[in-house]
């Protein structure tokens, strides 16, 4: 039947692959395909352009593009798998076409190698601690992965303690493993988080925003009260201020930051600074 | 404080011309969608089609019981709760249809040995319930950030005793219809993912074509709704 076919063709036309460059900063939906820069010329308008064959068969100059979170390779195109804004980072130096990724808002954490996270010790079995990091599996932490830990000198870690560490093994096939030392054997701020303070959960997007360089929120919060703060990439934040009231105020501000514009934030900070 | 994105859209799908007889009631009802309204689940959405409303929550990728884990992909579970009474056989069969649709679309191989649970609660049922459940499930999965290879939507249509096709039927239209067909279509090429049919009918092609045309509007609504959500951040 002619009618449904024309309707179908019209709907399919909207889903042709677009060049990644043109979609930067826009919201992309799962299922969209993006063309990498070197393929745009090949596709061309209409796609059936005749090209004279070059006798000097040079290998097509492939630019190495890194596919970040939210994107998958699908043939020689990028398939969007999460909804969010498409971002691109130019390569700092050397070759490569940079990194493309989708900035999405999520609450659930999936362990990634190298991420610094806050975990809660849930079990102690032999030489391994089981640490809940908010993912699908508890991570394992060996007692030797603390600074200055030896078989005789065991670290003082109890069930229920908060641990700040980083992942050394985190992929979809294996149980995640974390450590509290860096590659040189130094703690570098990691380890058991001290007494008191408050642990609360926020979305992953907010953490990334707060950890971005030159984040105004952190600078303003630092001017309010003296505080200790630890950010985990798994959406957990630990704060400690002099009094419980100050700690709670800080926790509320950080949780609310996500939905406030910078003007509203400045108002609240100035009101708090006065009182 | 919760971020709520309430998007209203009045969508009309007029399939006026064509060789098949189309009645005046060939338009989709008023749509509305709200995301991230529940604080506990990783993703949640409420989808409204006319007076039919379904609330969906997604948990995942989360821990899975050893008896239910699959070694190379995520275990997808769908729980559908009716508005009143205990879930029965009809709910079980709908859960299975929704689960099969979601499994075709969700990239489960990225999260092996985990579980992704979709919980659907019927808030009000005024026709096209399965289609509304599918739409709510899709929006909730997107809200939770579960990796998917495409979006999907559900479109229901009812065939009258004189062959008139009505899209998005109300409960009254469903009761009086000769056949009720529900299709789940994917967003990339409008391919058929799932179909659930009840009654006497002879021409699936016509209904499928009408559903594919209507799904265009649903996907456009999804896009607008998600763009509005991300424009606020």
Curated annotation (Swiss-Prot), chain A:
Keywords: Acetylation, Cytoplasm, Disease variant, Exosome, Isopeptide bond, Neurodegeneration, Nucleus, RNA-binding, rRNA processing, Ubl conjugation. InterPro entries: Exosome_RNA_bind1/RRP40/RRP4, KH_dom_type_1, KH_dom_type_1_sf, NA-bd_OB-fold, RRP40_KH-I, RRP40_N, Rrp40_S1. It is found in: Cytoplasm; Nucleus, Nucleolus; Nucleus. One of its GO terms (molecular function) is RNA binding. There is a cross-link at residue 151 (Glycyl lysine isopeptide (Lys-Gly) (interchain with G-Cter in SUMO2)). The modification N-acetylalanine is found at residue 2. Its main location: cytoplasm. One of its GO terms (cellular component) is cytosol. Non-catalytic component of the RNA exosome complex which has 3'->5' exoribonuclease activity and participates in a multitude of cellular RNA processing and degradation events. In the nucleus, the RNA exosome complex is involved in proper maturation of stable RNA species such as rRNA, snRNA and snoRNA, in the elimination of RNA processing by-products and non-coding 'pervasive' transcripts, such as antisense RNA species and promoter-upstream transcripts (PROMPTs), and of mRNAs with processing defects, thereby limiting or excluding their export to the cytoplasm. Belongs to the RRP40 family. Component of the RNA exosome core complex (Exo-9), composed of EXOSC1, EXOSC2, EXOSC3, EXOSC4, EXOSC5, EXOSC6, EXOSC7, EXOSC8 and EXOSC9; within the complex interacts with EXOSC5 and EXOSC9. The catalytically inactive RNA exosome core complex (Exo-9) associates with the catalytic subunit EXOSC10/RRP6. Exo-9 may associate with DIS3 to form the nucleolar exosome complex, or DIS3L to form the cytoplasmic exosome complex. Exo-9 is formed by a hexameric base ring consisting of the heterodimers EXOSC4-EXOSC9, EXOSC5-EXOSC8 and EXOSC6-EXOSC7, and a cap ring consisting of EXOSC1, EXOSC2 and EXOSC3. It is linked to Pontocerebellar hypoplasia 1B: A severe autosomal recessive neurologic disorder characterized by a combination of cerebellar and spinal motor neuron degeneration beginning at birth. There is diffuse muscle weakness, progressive microcephaly, global developmental delay, and brainstem involvement. This is Exosome complex component RRP40. It comes from Homo sapiens (Human). The lineage of its organism: Eukaryota, Metazoa, Chordata, Craniata, Vertebrata.
């Amino acid at each position: 039947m002619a009618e449904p076919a024309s309707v179908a063709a019209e709907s399919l036309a909207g889903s042709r692959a677009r060049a990644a460059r043109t979609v930067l900063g826009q919201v992309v939906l799962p299922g969209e395909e993006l063309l990498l820069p070197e393929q745009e010329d090949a596709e061309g308008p209409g796609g059936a352009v005749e090209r004279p064959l070059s006798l000097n068969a040079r290998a097509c100059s492939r630019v190495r593009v890194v596919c970040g979170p939210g994107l998958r390779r699908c043939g020689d195109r990028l398939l969007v798998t999460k909804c969010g804004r498409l971002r691109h980072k130019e390569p700092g130096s050397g070759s490569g076409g940079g990194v493309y990724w989708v900035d999405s808002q999520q609450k659930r954490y999936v362990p990634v190698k190298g991420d610094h996270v806050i975990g809660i010790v849930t079990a102690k079995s032999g030489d391994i601690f089981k640490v809940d990091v908010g993912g699908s599996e508890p991570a394992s932490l060996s007692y030797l992965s603390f600074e200055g830990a030896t078989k005789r000198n065991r670290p003082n870690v109890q069930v229920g303690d908060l641990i700040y560490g980083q992942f050394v093994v985190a992929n979809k096939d294996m149980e995640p493993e974390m450590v509290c030392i860096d590659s040189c054997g130094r703690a570098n701020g990691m380890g058991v988080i001290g007494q008191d303070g408050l642990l609360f959960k926020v979305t992953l997007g907010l953490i990334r925003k707060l950890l971005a360089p030159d984040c105004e929120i952190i600078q303003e919060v630092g001017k309010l009260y003296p505080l200790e703060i630890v950010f985990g990439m798994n959406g957990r934040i630990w704060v400690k201020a002099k009094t419980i009231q100050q700690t709670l105020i800080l926790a509320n501000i950080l949780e609310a930051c996500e939905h406030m514009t910078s003007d509203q934030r400045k108002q609240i900070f100035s009101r708090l600074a006065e009182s | 404080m919760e971020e709520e994105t309430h998007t209203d859209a009045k969508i009309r799908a007029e399939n006026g011309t064509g060789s098949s007889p189309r009645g005046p009631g060939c338009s989709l009802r008023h749509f509305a969608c709200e995301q991230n309204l529940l604080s506990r689940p990783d993703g949640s959405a409420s989808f409204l089609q006319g007076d039919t409303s379904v609330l969906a929550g997604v948990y995942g990728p989360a821990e899975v019981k050893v008896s239910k884990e699959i070694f190379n992909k995520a275990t997808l579970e769908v729980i559908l709760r009716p508005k009143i009474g205990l879930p029965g056989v009809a709910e079980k069969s709908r859960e299975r249809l929704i689960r099969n649709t979601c499994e075709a679309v969700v990239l489960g191989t990225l999260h092996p040995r985990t579980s992704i649970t979709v919980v659907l609660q019927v808030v009000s049922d005024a026709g096209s319930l399965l289609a509304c459940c599918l739409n709510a499930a899709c929006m909730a999965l997107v809200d939770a950030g579960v990796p998917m290879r495409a979006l999907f939507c559900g479109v229901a249509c009812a065939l009258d005793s004189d062959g008139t096709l009505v899209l998005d039927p109300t409960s009254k239209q469903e009761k009086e219809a000769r056949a009720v067909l529900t299709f789940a279509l994917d967003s990339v090429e409008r391919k058929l993912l799932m179909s659930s049919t009840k009654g006497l009918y002879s021409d699936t092609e016509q209904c499928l074509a009408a559903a594919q045309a209507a799904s265009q509007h649903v996907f456009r609504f999804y896009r607008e709704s998600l763009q509005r959500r991300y424009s606020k951040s």
